[in-house]
Amino acid sequence: MKVLVLNCGSSSVKYKLLEMPKGDVLAQGGVEKLGLPGSFLKLTMPNGEKVVLEKDMPEHTIAVEFILSVLKDDKYGCIKSYEEIDAVGHRLVHGGEKFSNSVEITPEVIAKVEECIPLAPLHNPANLKGVVAIEKLLPGIRQVGVFDTAFFQTMPEHVYRYALPYDMCNKHGVRRYGFHGTSHRYVSARACEILGLDYDKTRIITAHIGNGASIAAIKNGKALDVSLGMTPVEGLMMGTRSGDVDPGVLTFLMEAEGLEAAGISELINKKSGVLGVSGVSSDMREIEDAIKNGNERATLAMTMYDYRIKKYVGAYAAAMGGVDVLVFTGGVGENQYTTREKVCTDMEFMGIVFDSKVNEGMRGKEMVISKPESKVTVIVVPTDEEYMIASDTMTILK
């Protein structure tokens, strides 16, 4: 079964064509600068070669149409006919409280996703444009929506509810939703598969650490808690997002700096986090270079970043009454050994006995980085959200 996975953002469309159930990647790439001058499609050939194809793509339907044409292209493609594509799976960011599982996309589902647009005003409209584009370009093909938020619908009310006026929260849908759910679901299940553990009887902490970052507590196969909240700003310090901050600071700054709501939103989403503290960059590779050159603010930013992760690991271990597996994933989690080491150092009291030597040589592959005597297994699992979306698509449509 060939499944095309689409992840449509406001100015990008990422895609992967997978042969299921094995998960072999037949084609992958993405459109960038969609709707802007200089838009292009970057694709990865089977031999790893990167190819850039420039084309004016003012909107999503034209971008998806170009992707489909490249999939069938004699030089760059891998299929002879669009009929070879059996189904399309979409990343849908926000399903609110309406979706606790992946679903086949119908007019009723589209209407419910549209109702969630106020909760994700940038993402949901873009996601739906991909659905509409496929309906137009491949009429009759079945489509499945996989929600970032669905995995966390198992959180109990005392976890997802904020300590704000009860009726006001209900009126506006204010609660913890969590994001990166597809990634947390994949790496937690994959870790148990690698380690030979029963997913439904294991306490797992998953750390999805990249430019955006979140930590989840997964107990006996169900999400118990997650650091991201109603929006993707809460929790860990991120590339440009603040993470946890005293809400009173925001009202103080509104008065002190003369900021309106839009200004505060830009501050905590785009000007804070690692970038805001370091004054250097939101890219951890550039931060590491700055640290080597003696930049004190870059050093401070990195120390804060690592500390926040460690604090959440401890909190979630307490919330679950212990932990059996700690998983690192995401761009930083998979590739930056220094962050993994800082998080896991001096954690013997919690059952973590870390193997610094193995950790230092480990980048971007599945690997246990704790010692055999460690009561908590620490493991790196590269995330594969596209495989998870394709897997859900196959399961639902079978």
UniProtKB/Swiss-Prot annotation:
SUPFAM superfamilies: Actin-like ATPase domain. Pathway: Metabolic intermediate biosynthesis; acetyl-CoA biosynthesis; acetyl-CoA from acetate: step 1/2. GO terms for cellular component: cytoplasm. The keyword Nucleotide-binding applies. Belongs to the acetokinase family. Keywords: ATP-binding, Cytoplasm, Kinase, Magnesium, Metal-binding, Nucleotide-binding, Transferase. Catalyzes the formation of acetyl phosphate from acetate and ATP. Can also catalyze the reverse reaction. ATP binds at residues 14, 208-212, 283-285, 331-335. This is Acetate kinase. InterPro entries: Ac/propionate_kinase (IPR004372), Aliphatic_acid_kin_short-chain (IPR000890), Aliphatic_acid_kinase_CS (IPR023865), ATPase_NBD (IPR043129). Its cofactor is Mg(2+); Mn(2+). Mg(2+). Can also accept Mn(2+). Substrate binds at residue 91. GO terms for molecular function: acetate kinase activity; ATP binding; magnesium ion binding. It is found in: Cytoplasm. It comes from Porphyromonas gingivalis (strain ATCC BAA-308 / W83). Its EC number is 2.7.2.1. The active site is at residue 148. Mg(2+) binds at residues 7, 385. PANTHER family: ACETATE KINASE, ACETATE KINASE-RELATED. The keyword Cytoplasm applies. Its main location: cytoplasm.
